[in-house]
Amino acid sequence: MWEKCHRQWHKIKFYVKHAHLGLLPPAWLAKSAAAELERFERAPAELRAAIENRVHYYNALSQPFFLPETAPRVCHFPRQKPSSYYYDLKALLRYFPLEQRFSAQFGDVTTIPELPQFVKSRPITKNNENAVLLKLDSVRHFYLYPDRLPFRAKKSQLVWRGAAHQNHRIRFLEHFHQHPLCDVGCIHARSAAKPYHREFMSVKRQLQYRYILSLEGNDVATNLKWIMASNSLCLMPAPRYETWMMEGRLQAGVHYVQLRDDFADLEEQILFFERYPEAAEAIIKNAQQWMSQFARPETELWTALLVMKKYFSLLEPQ
C-alpha cells in the first residue's frame, strides 16, 4: 500500500507542478536562461567543471546546422502526447526566446536522427551527436524508491519482472525461469500460458533481493535507475542505449556487474558475489554515488539549460 501511494504521489506531484505549462500562453511562462545561468557561474569550480563535462556528453554537436522553416518554435509548441515528454521539454523551452526554433523526438529513440534533435534516448555508438539528450519522461525513468534494507539482509537470489516481447528477454526467461538462483518472469497477460509467466511484483518487493537484473527492451531498461540507487546489485549485459543517466559511461565491475549477452555467466556471477559480498557492496556504493549526480534539481536545471544553449548557439538562422 505504501509503495503504491509513494509512486502515485510521485506522479501527482509531477503533473500538478507542470499542468500550467499546457494551459498558459508562452509569453506568461517565459523565464530567463541567462538569469538562471548566472547562478551557475557562481557555483564552485569543481561543480561547474562536472556539469560542463556532462553538457558536452549530452550534446556532442560541434558544427553549425540548419533546421527547416517548418520546425516548431517555442511560442508555437502545442500540447502533445506523451504528456510527460511534453511537460519536461516545455519546462525548459520557456527559458529561451519565443521565436526560437528547435526539433525534438519523443518516445524510444533507437536510431540517430538526420537533423539534431532533443531526445530521451539514443544508441551508444560513435557519431551520435544529432541525438541531443535531455531528461525527458523523467516521471517514469527517474522514479526512485527508498531502500533501507542492507545488501546482506536481502534474499540471495536474482529477481526480474517485466514484459517479455523482445527475443532476448524471451530467451532469458526460457533458460532461467526455473533456476534456483532466480525469481524471474513475464507479467504480461499474453504470456499467461507460458511457463515463465509470473504475477506482478512491486519495486518494494524486488528490493528485498540482493541481485536485480536490468534488461533493455525497446531502448533503455526503466528499472536501471532505481536499481542503481538501491542497496541491491545490478546485473545486466553491456547497455546499447543511453539516456540522461549516461549509461554509456557506466563501467562494468565498477557501477554494475556485466553479463554475457547469452547470460551464460549469470550463475557464476551470482555465486561469486555470494562468496565475496564486500565486492558487491563496493559496486553498490559506486552505483549510488553515480546516481547522486542527478539528485539536485538546481544542478539538473543548469545542466539542461546549458545543453540547450549549446544547441541553439549552433543553430543557423534562416
From Swiss-Prot:
Keywords for the protein's UniProt record, in alphabetical order: Glycosyltransferase, Lipopolysaccharide biosynthesis, Transferase
Pathway(s) annotated for this protein in UniProt: Protein modification; protein glycosylation
Gene Ontology process terms (BP): lipopolysaccharide biosynthetic process; protein glycosylation
Example GO molecular function: glycosyltransferase activity
Database matches in InterPro entries: CAP10, O-Glucosyltr/Glycosyltrsf_90
A Pfam family per the record: Glyco_transf_90
Methyltransferase keyword on record: no
EC number: 2.4.1.-
Record's function text: Involved in lipopolysaccharide core biosynthesis.
Family: Belongs to the glycosyltransferase 90 family.
The name this protein goes by in its record: O-glucosyltransferase LpsA
Source organism: Dichelobacter nodosus
Gene transcribed to yield this protein: lpsA
